[in-house]
């Protein structure tokens, strides 16, 4: 699949893993960020977990096993987007990006990830709770917030990786 398509893995997280992550989120600190390399006036939230063992070892090993290729971790972090806090179209500057969607999801909320692959194919992925997507880090992409002010924050866990 590498560099040619988007890999989608539904129900990537066990219920225990999901609970562990949500417990961590409840106590973490968020920082403001904008899409890589952009001078956007709209920011969204981020929290780096690259140095947290549960994320950089346990879950990262599960991501690697699912990919089936040897990769090294560049960065792991949470993205948080409230209604109206959109990212910009951007690339990640890594070989592979994985996103694990964590928030509740309803189809009418939107919140999809839009990706443009090398062959100009556009892929739209809905952020189903517990779903993981993997895609070439250099493909142009954007994460959209949920559509309504009454929706929860759209939270994903991002892994940026390089081939070994």
Regions inferred by a protein language model and the residue ranges of each:
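Catalytic core of non-heme Fe(II) oxygenases with the double-stranded beta-helix
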Residues: 57, 61-164
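Non-heme Fe(II)/2-oxoglutarate
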Residues: 1-70, 81
